[in-house]
Amino acid sequence: MPFHSRTIGSSADGTVETHDGSHVLRFERYLPHSIEQVWAAITEPEQLVSWLAEAEIDLSLGGHVRLRWLNADEQGNRAVMNATITQLEPPRLLEYAGDIHGTLRFELREEASGCILTFSSTLPASNAGLPLQLAGWHTHLDFLAEALNGQAVDWPHWPIDRWTRHYERYAQKRRAKQEGDHSSQKGNL
């Protein structure tokens, strides 16, 4: 079921739709900033590092995207995504297909005194880590809202407790869904 209510900046939970052999994780956020400001935050390397990852971007159709996340796991490993831009309509649409995290899509539309960001990540249906993915994207979109307000993430000391709270909530929703109606292929988790 698509997400329809408006939440300013952060806290809006993501949803999952499963169809055609894929999971589509979707978030919708109202951001009290212009489309141009949000577009810059999702496309310019010096802004991406403040909320998502170190980035190299050839902002052209077919262009290469490389994201290197700055938060590390317990062993110090950092995720790196290599992707190709598959859709580009500045300043409203950016989509790239990557080797990890699937296809990422950022859609912007004007809304009174700001814009709506619809973010989605399309993953193979075999992906069992949906609560992990949802918690990660939820946290990064919260960081985006904060970065647009001038607060960059302190990556060496990033707030894992926030991610953990999101993960526990999504994992609980996933378990409840699995215990509920198994016949539906479409739902919130």
Predicted features along the sequence, with ranges:
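Hydrophobic/aromatic beta-strand elements that line small-molecule binding cavities or substrate pockets
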Residues: 29, 55, 81-87, 103-110
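Short beta-edge strand/loop motif at the mouth of beta-sheet-based domains
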Residues: 26-27, 33, 37, 44-82, ...
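Structural motif
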Residues: 21, 88-90, 111-113
